Structure formats: structure tokens, C-alpha cells
């Protein structure tokens, strides 16, 4: 595979290999047959990052080969959304003849949405001044006139210049409802929107008919908690990153959801609060004991859950666990399977043509 050519004819084989690998990893835990959710075979990534190569008067996007570290010129990138592919040549064509915009530009990041909005971040090895802002505004206006719904950001050491705003608003159709999600530049968002929709709908189906409240750790911008709110009395969700918490609060209001409470704290801190080990000012006005959480939802980073959080999670009757690293999931399941059984297993092909897998398990406590 090269950045400009996807092995589309191999898609089914690579998905079958992942499915078999997941079966093998989950076999020790008596997991059921996985439900498998396919990705679009091209234009599935909603974001992309490119280094910029200066070659005389020429300017082009490059990536580096992971094995050889050689640079590869990238004029089109079929893994990325069609919107990013349309924008890439127009962006370079506008920057190339402008010495103010191109000087010491070393990277361009794109974040696009199914709703048609896109953020472009230009990264520089130099200070950005008022002259840069004037030229950047002209670039933004030129691309807007070409029909792009675009936000432009300049970044340099300890500098972030936002011409208008640093976010886009995504709209995802989830089980009959359009969900609005504010996505902030340089914050985590699910890279594959089509697969994200399938993940949300699987989680909704897995928790249908739930009783009581939902606790979510690592909620990000509220991707799962807002979609799942319709299945629960109330949702209590934690997140540590300030921009993600702010986006989640906006998303709650934008979707007119009234039963979700977001608190800014790490999963480890929340564990201490639940166990009564520490008190936190951030929890003033929130009565943790009033929540009857029968279900806990976790979507941890690649490192998985730490030992203390595994113990916290294990106390809940139902656990919904989304993992971007089945190896750390397997490690956590060694403990969780002592008390819980896997009722559902899913493979989400979030990262086609790579060895990476995203998966989901629903666990229920044995009686």
C-alpha cells in the first residue's frame, strides 16, 4: 500500500484476517461470534496530516514510509475524505506563489466532517505576525469563494492564531436521529465517521432496554454518552481534557439532551471520589450517591484501563468496553472475566488496510 494507492481488491481478505485474529484473542474468554462492521473502502478518514516539502519553487504534501523512512510525494490521498482530496491541491496552489504563507511552512493538518466543514491548520518553524494574518485571511476568503466551508488556523511554537474559530460542527445520523458534535482542532475525534456511526448504533442496540443510569469514563466530546442518553435515565460522564469538556457541554445543549452530566476529572480521580478516598471541589453540587449506575461505558486510550479502574469497572453489573487495542483489552479481560461473561463482541474496521483493530464487548456480571 502507498499513500496514493489503496489495495481495495484486498479489503475483504484483510477484514477476514482481522476477524480471525480477534476470534483467537477472545477465545480464552468464551466470547460469542463477533459482529463485523465494514469500513468504506476509500475516503473513510476524516482527518489527515502531511509534512510539506519545499523543492525550489515547488511545494507538495509528503508522508514518510514507515519502514524505509523515505519521503513519498502525495498529490492525492484516497484514504482521506473526498473533501480533503478536493482541498489539498487548491490549498497548495494558493500558498505556493505567496512567500509570506509558504516561508518555513512545514506541515498541514486537515480535519473534515460529513457535514461539509473543514479545519486546516498551517504549522510553521517561525513566528507568525500581522502580515501573516493578512495573507491568511486572503487565503481563507479565496478558498471560501471556491465553495469550501473552511476554518484556517496558524500554529508556531507557543502560538495558535485562529482567524475565526477552532472547531467544526459534525452531524451524524444515528439510529434515526441527527446528532450534532462539535469537534475542536487538535482534540481527539473518531477518525472514520462511517464506522463511528456503526459503533454508536451497535452500542445503542447493546444497551437497549437498560435500567438505571450510565457512567462513562473518557467521554471526549460526548460522542458515545450523548447517543446513549436515550437508553438511560441519566448519564454521568468524565473527561480530563478542557477543550473536549467544553465541546461536550456545547453538544449537550445543541442536541437538547437534558439527562447528561459531564465532570472534568481523570478516571483515576473519579475512582478515588467513588471510593470516598478523596473529595473534589469539582464535584460540588453533584450527588454521586444519587446515581443508580447499572451500566458503565469505557473507551480508554491504547494503554487500556489501569488496575484501579479495572476494579472500579468490575463492580458494575454491565460493562460496555470499546477498545482501539485488543491486546490491552485482553489483559483487562483476564480480571473482568473472573466476574463477568462476554455477551456481545464486535469488530469495527476503523483503520482499514492496517493491522489496527477497534472492537467492542458487552459484559454482564454472573449471578
Swiss-Prot record:
NCBIfam families from the UniProt entry: trmA_only (TIGR02143)
Organism domain of life: Bacteria
Record keywords, A-Z: Methyltransferase, S-adenosyl-L-methionine, Transferase, tRNA processing
One Gene Ontology biological process: tRNA methylation
Entry's EC annotation: 2.1.1.-, 2.1.1.35
GO molecular function term, any single one: tRNA (uracil(54)-C5)-methyltransferase activity, S-adenosyl methionine-dependent
Function: Dual-specificity methyltransferase that catalyzes the formation of 5-methyluridine at position 54 (m5U54) in all tRNAs, and that of position 341 (m5U341) in tmRNA (transfer-mRNA).
Name of one Pfam family that matches: tRNA_U5-meth_tr
Residues that, per the record, bind S-adenosyl-L-methionine: 190, 218, 223, 239, 299
Catalytic reaction annotation: uridine(54) in tRNA + S-adenosyl-L-methionine = 5-methyluridine(54) in tRNA + S-adenosyl-L-homocysteine + H(+); uridine(341) in tmRNA + S-adenosyl-L-methionine = 5-methyluridine(341) in tmRNA + S-adenosyl-L-homocysteine + H(+)
Gene source species: Pectobacterium atrosepticum (strain SCRI 1043 / ATCC BAA-672) (Erwinia carotovora subsp. atroseptica)
Entry annotation: catalytic residues: 324 (nucleophile), 358 (proton acceptor)
Family label: Belongs to the class I-like SAM-binding methyltransferase superfamily. RNA M5U methyltransferase family. TrmA subfamily.
Cellular compartments per GO CC: cytosol
PANTHER family linked to this entry: TRNA/TMRNA (URACIL-C(5))-METHYLTRANSFERASE, TRNA_TMRNA (URACIL-C(5))-METHYLTRANSFERASE
Encoding gene per record: trmA
HAMAP family xrefs: RNA_methyltr_TrmA
PROSITE patterns to which the protein is assigned, alphabetical: SAM_MT_RNA_M5U, TRMA_1, TRMA_2
Class of enzymatic activity (EC top level): transferase
CDD domains named among the record's database cross-references: AdoMet_MTases
Coiled coil: none
Name of this protein: tRNA/tmRNA (uracil-C(5))-methyltransferase
